[in-house]
Amino acid sequence: ITGSCGLVGSEAVNFFSKKGFDVVGIDNNLRKFFFGNEGSTTKIKNNLIKNNKRFKHYDIDIRNFNSLEKIYKKYKKNISLIIHCAAQPSHDYGKNFPILDFNVNASGTLNLLELTKKYCAESPFIFMSTNKVYGDNPNKLNFIENKTRWEIKKNNKYYNGIDERFSIDNCTHSF
């Protein structure tokens, strides 16, 4: 699980550890770099290690192909699933530093895909993303305003969630 100390990644670690799986987590606490000490995921990492005996953490940047390859070589065919949650998390930072943003989000992902193909091609690769990829298109859905929340009508094809068929074309993004 990449981004294993982030919001979604840490939940995946807890879920699969509690199901009895051995979980390898990769996270380099990039949030601290972007957001300072208040963005650090060190406490989350320490809690994951303390509470999940089947969890092994590696402090690796997904842009570092050689470091990632060491992990893939170590676990090889024991890798039964890859959940990719790692990303450059700051949209404002991405606007100001687009090359770094691209290197983490695109090149890092490509590293993982290539290594998965080489060492465990039969294993599913789940790529997590952000709602930001949809830009303003979700705002065009026909919502119902309730007392405490907005909902989509039950007969809407996206009632149970938005999947990969939802268009990201011709929409505004973070900048």
Predicted regions and their residues:
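N-terminal Rossmann-like NAD(P)+-binding domain of SDR-like oxidoreductases, especially those catalyzing
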Residues: 1-175
